């Protein structure tokens, strides 16, 4: 099998064999050989050779290829959505939205480059001040499994249109989606060496991250891995490092008139994508008293009816499987640890089959857990915290080293003003789910949730560096000389 894409051609990997599986059926979705360290080196050197011509190509020509990529994505939407659903378990309805987001990213990235970077000129008394932006060179892109098309695409598209060349290492849990995506780039006319694909597991990633010929590393994934990368590159200021990581995100419920609307947004926040969005709400803050009791009862009632099924089921389910049987078992174990620490299960999570990734949406009350662990449980496990007053809710919501997303559901505009001023997060929503984000806005967080704003509008900032020039078309001796100079 030819599973690697190096220097414009599909080639076989020379590393160990591995496979991805459909988490809803346990069928093999993709199999092949991983990239060895030598394969990774070939990919990086191919990108290095391609950089001079690609970066010298005019911006409009680079954008034309990206636009062709977007058009082909739309033409192949159903096939790509099926590939995403097969490897991740997410339902087709949601996988289709991922492909649409991939295509839309091209126009957003082009606009972002022109508005945030690009070229600007300002006249001076004796010349012109010019601000240009230059690509870094060869950048490594590490993709996650939860959005294996959309999230790495949010690094790759702005990197390419800025003039960088890319070596892409996708998640080992979704290699088939990466292969299909790179095939679209190839068919869009991307020159050889500009985008290279190295498949593999941990050793492949280490070989790529440790290579001395990369100029940047753009990562979307877990906070633990991102933190290790941050430590690794701490002594290398020449490497641009963009990290988008996880969050222990809070959603605060106020006393609202429309309880069903609040329950809907809470379910979307906690359980969309089977809870496998980095912006999903992990901690739900519910007021004590009669209103909180009514809200919680309705939340439990609707949650108990949520269906989970295979990605191509008819009718379509709200949730699919989580990424693997192992991930499902880890979620159940996380719930058990919380219960051991004093949490009360309201809807207990169970794994349907030990071979599969199906778990039900779960709700546990952690109000009485004395030292609630500041951990991201990446799945449909909602933790309820009952609060006495609004300031207590905000204080406990901010009691985290993360800072990705936060939300408030409240009718009171004054409560919102107070919330947005005091909450600590990069994405803060009012009467919208925590995982709702505008593609035209920066995406990312503070603290252990990462740096920069990858995968969205502000990606242009880390895909090119500013180069300032003072220019004059004519070389002339100044009319006024500095003291001590004689001509």
From Swiss-Prot:
Q: Please give the CDD domains that the UniProt record associates with this protein.
A: ALDH_SGSD_AstD (cd07095)
* GO molecular-function terms, A-Z: succinylglutamate-semialdehyde dehydrogenase activity
Per UniProt, NAD(+) binds at 221-226
Q: In which pathway does it act?
A: Amino-acid degradation; L-arginine degradation via AST pathway; L-glutamate and succinate from L-arginine: step 4/5
Q: Which UniProt keywords apply?
A: Arginine metabolism, NAD, Oxidoreductase
Question: According to its UniProt record, which reaction does this protein catalyse?
Answer: N-succinyl-L-glutamate 5-semialdehyde + NAD(+) + H2O = N-succinyl-L-glutamate + NADH + 2 H(+)
Active site per UniProt: 244, 278
> Per its UniProt entry, which superkingdom is the organism in?
Bacteria
The Gene Ontology biological process terms listed for this entry are: arginine catabolic process to glutamate; arginine catabolic process to succinate
Q: What is its EC number?
A: 1.2.1.71
Q: Does the keyword Membrane apply?
A: no
Matching entries from HAMAP family are given as: Aldedh_AstD
* Function text: Catalyzes the NAD-dependent reduction of succinylglutamate semialdehyde into succinylglutamate.
The UniProt entry's sequence similarity note says:
Belongs to the aldehyde dehydrogenase family. AstD subfamily.
| Name of the protein in question | N-succinylglutamate 5-semialdehyde dehydrogenase
Query: Gene encoding this polypeptide?
Result: astD
């Amino acid at each position: 099998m030819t599973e690697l894409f190096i220097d414009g051609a599909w080639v076989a990997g020379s590393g160990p064999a591995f496979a991805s599986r459909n988490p809803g059926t346990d069928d093999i979705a993709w199999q092949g050989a991983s990239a060895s360290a030598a394969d990774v080196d070939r990919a990086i050197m191919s990108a290095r050779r391609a950089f001079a011509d690609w970066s010298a190509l005019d911006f409009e020509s680079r954008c034309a290829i990206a636009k062709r990529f977007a058009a082909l994505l739309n033409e192949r939407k159903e096939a790509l959505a099926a590939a995403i659903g097969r490897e991740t378990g997410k339902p087709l309805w949601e996988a289709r939205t991922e492909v649409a987001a991939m295509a839309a990213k091209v126009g957003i990235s082009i606009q972002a480059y022109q508005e945030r970077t690009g070229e600007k000129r300002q006249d001076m008394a004796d010349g012109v001040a010019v601000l240009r932006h230059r690509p870094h060179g060869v950048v490594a892109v590490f993709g996650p499994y939860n959005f294996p098309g959309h999230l790495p695409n949010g690094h790759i598209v702005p990197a390419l249109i800025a003039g960088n060349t890319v070596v892409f290492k996708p998640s080992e849990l979704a290699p088939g989606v990466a292969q299909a995506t790179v095939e679209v780039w190839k068919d869009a006319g991307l020159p050889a060496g500009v985008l290279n694909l190295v498949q593999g597991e941990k050793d492949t990633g280490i070989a790529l991250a440790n290579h001395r010929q990369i100029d940047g590393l753009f990562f979307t994934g877990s906070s633990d891995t991102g933190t290790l990368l941050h430590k690794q590159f701490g002594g290398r200021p020449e490497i641009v490092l963009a990290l988008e990581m996880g969050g222990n995100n809070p959603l605060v419920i106020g006393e609202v008139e429309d309880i069903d609307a609040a329950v809907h947004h809470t379910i979307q926040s906690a359980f969309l994508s089977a809870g496998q969005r980095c912006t999903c709400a992990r901690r739900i803050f519910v007021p004590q008293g009669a209103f909180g009791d009514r809200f919680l009862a309705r939340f439990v009632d609707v949650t108990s009816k949520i269906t989970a099924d295979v990605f191509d089921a008819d009718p379509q389910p709200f949730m699919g499987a989580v990424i693997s049987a192992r991930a499902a078992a880890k979620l159940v174990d996380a719930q058990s640890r919380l219960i051991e620490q004093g949490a009360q299960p309201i809807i207990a999570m169970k794994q349907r089959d030990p071979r599969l990734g199906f778990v039900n949406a779960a709700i546990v009350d952690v109000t009485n857990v004395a030292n609630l662990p500041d951990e991201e449980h990446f799945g449909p496990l909602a933790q309820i915290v009952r609060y006495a007053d609004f300031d207590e809710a905000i204080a406990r919501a901010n009691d985290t080293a993360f800072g990705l997303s936060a939300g408030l559901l409240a009718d009171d505009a004054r409560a919102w003003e107070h919330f947005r001023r005091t909450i600590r997060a990069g994405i803060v929503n009012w009467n919208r789910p925590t995982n709702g984000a505008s593609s035209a806005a920066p995406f990312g967080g503070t603290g252990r949730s990462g740096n920069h704003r990858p995968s969205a509008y502000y990606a242009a900032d880390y895909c090119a560096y500013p180069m300032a020039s003072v220019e004059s078309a004519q070389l002339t001796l100044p009319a006024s000389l500095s003291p001590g100079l004689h001509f």
